Structure formats: C-alpha cells, structure tokens
Swiss-Prot record:
Monomer. SUPFAM superfamilies: RmlC-like cupins. This is Acireductone dioxygenase. The record marks 105 as: Important to generate the dianion.
Length: 180
C-alpha cells in the first residue's frame, strides 16, 4: 500500500502527516509541485519480461505521458535483490540530488521511497505498483528501495541522455532512513 509521511527536516522520529489515502497523498504532494497518481496497472507483465517487452506493453501509456511532459525518451529500470549493481545503485540513489528535468516514474511492479526535501520538510512518498510520480526539476530528493530492491519502473526523460543527477552534498538522507 502506498503511503506518504511528512516530517519536519529536523525531526525524523515524528511524522507530521502519515496517510495511505491516495487522494490526500496527491493533494499533499501537489502542494509542493509533485504529481502523484494511482493507476490500475493496465498491463500484465511476466517476471522475466525484457525491458523492450515492458516498453512495448506500456507504449500507449508512455506515448500519452511523453506527450504531456514533452519527454524525448523512456527506459525501464529493473532491480532485483540479486542485481549485480544493487548496492552501488542504492548508494548513488540515496544521496540527495536534483535533476534539471522532472523525474517521472511509473511503478510497474514492486516499490520504493521517493523522498523530497524542501521548505524545511521531508516528504517520504512510498510508491507501489500502479503509482505514477513526477518530481519537478531542481527538487532536492533521493530514492530508496531498500537493501533487497525488487521493482520495475518506467522512467521518462526530456533529456535523451537519461538519468543525470547533480548531488547536493547534503547528508540529510542519512538522518531519514526510510527502507530497511
């Protein structure tokens, strides 16, 4: 189940807001410019589906999203607990960073935490299968799928060079552990 927890950025122990209500999640996130939607997962994907098969299965949805956002490319990130780069990628994603474009993700399977840091607050959006999240350009954030990641997500990019992060150097993510 998807959840949203909002914290004062000086107090990781006591959420100011905790909800699993999709409408409230969307409203709270919209207030900081983040798009959040729950979609009925429109396509059944085999566990061993290739990235190309996943992109093709979701093509109508991708075309619509790419048209809305002006995106020029899409790819699939597929993480499993035995992925050879799981630890390395987790460490990279865990560091607070920004992008110069919106970060748009749709969870095909599995889950992960998108954590945004702005205006003295930390917004932990735990996204699950069927969730669409779009984090605006230049929003400080990090991502955590835990030490045993297991998810498939569509990633949509305006910049055709793909995922390009600009790390802030802020160590706040270490104070806000969100996944085991």
């Amino acid at each position: 189940m998807s959840t949203l927890r909002i914290f004062d950025d000086a107090n990781p122990d006591a959420p100011l807001v905790a909800t699993s209500d999709a409408a409230r999640m969307a409203a709270e996130l919209k207030s900081i410019g983040v798009r959040f939607e729950r979609w009925e997962s429109p396509v059944a994907i085999a566990a061993d589906a290739s990235p190309e098969e996943i992109l093709e299965a979701y093509r109508p949805y991708l075309d619509r999203l790419m048209g809305e956002t002006g995106a020029g490319s899409a790819d699939v990130i597929k993480m499993t607990p035995d992925h050879p780069q799981a630890g390395t990628l987790r460490e990279k994603f865990l560091n607070e960073h920004i992008h110069t474009e919106d970060e748009v993700r749709f969870f095909v399977r599995g889950s992960g935490h998108f954590v945004m840091h702005l205006d003295g607050k930390v917004y932990d959006a735990y996204c699950t299968e069927g969730d669409l999240i779009s984090v605006p350009a230049n929003t400080r954030h990090w991502f955590d799928a835990g030490s045993t990641p297991d998810f498939i997500a569509l990633r949509i990019f305006t910049d055709t060079s793909g995922w390009v992060a600009h790390f802030t150097g802020d160590q706040i993510s270490a104070r806000f552990p969100v996944a085991a």
